[in-house]
Amino acid sequence: MTLTAGVVAVQGDVSEHAAAIRRAADAHGQPADVREIRTAGVVPECDVLLLPGGESTAISRLLDREGIDAEIRSHVAAGKPLLATCAGLIVSSTDANDDRVETLDVLDVTVDRNAFGRQVDSFEAPLDVDGLADPFPAVFIRAPVIDEVGADATVLASWDGRPVAIRDGPVVATSFHPELTADVRLHELAFFDRTPSAQAGDA
């Protein structure tokens, strides 16, 4: 059965996420049909969604203007998986600590935007992630931090004592960019019954 995956194609690493979900699906013996989402009407056709990074205020405005935000909320309410990364985490949150960001309120967290500094301060670090046997090569670029975690959410990984990956029901969100590595285990963790394959980060 083909997996229909939608990538919100407003900003961010759209092609990288598309490639990652194809590799993750292939690792589980399942073909993937990847669709780019720019207007309403595509989300209801998708089994899984990816919300990449970019600029959170711009992303939230476009989602609201096009009516994609309501479709994403319905997708999550139906128990369908969503992987949100970096600015996608901010937009997905309950509270972005920024009135300019219209959040989706599908991830019960409060977020501190750009908590890990400017783009020049970006870094990569091996990260222990709950559910993964080996450290994940996490790429942080002006990354947000999860300040507060709701009762139903679970912290999957922390860096320097602060949460940077979380699961809330069908939503997995990361402060870092899993699509910028050859390691697709985070995409597997989000979309394939929480059973990532035994794939090394340099595969």
From Swiss-Prot:
GO terms for biological process: glutamine catabolic process; pyridoxal phosphate biosynthetic process; pyridoxine metabolic process. Pfam families: SNO. Keywords: Glutamine amidotransferase, Hydrolase, Lyase, Pyridoxal phosphate. Disulfide bonds: none annotated. The active site is at C86 (nucleophile), H177 (charge relay system), E179 (charge relay system). The keyword Lyase applies. One of its GO terms (molecular function) is glutaminase activity. It catalyses: aldehydo-D-ribose 5-phosphate + D-glyceraldehyde 3-phosphate + L-glutamine = pyridoxal 5'-phosphate + L-glutamate + phosphate + 3 H2O + H(+); L-glutamine + H2O = L-glutamate + NH4(+). Pathway: Cofactor biosynthesis; pyridoxal 5'-phosphate biosynthesis. It comes from the Archaea. Its EC number is 4.3.3.6, 3.5.1.2. GO terms for cellular component: cytosol; glutaminase complex. HAMAP family: PdxT (MF_01615). PANTHER family: PYRIDOXAL 5'-PHOSPHATE SYNTHASE SUBUNIT SNO, PYRIDOXAL 5'-PHOSPHATE SYNTHASE SUBUNIT SNO1-RELATED. In the presence of PdxS, forms a dodecamer of heterodimers. Only shows activity in the heterodimer. Belongs to the glutaminase PdxT/SNO family. This is Pyridoxal 5'-phosphate synthase subunit PdxT. The gene is pdxT.
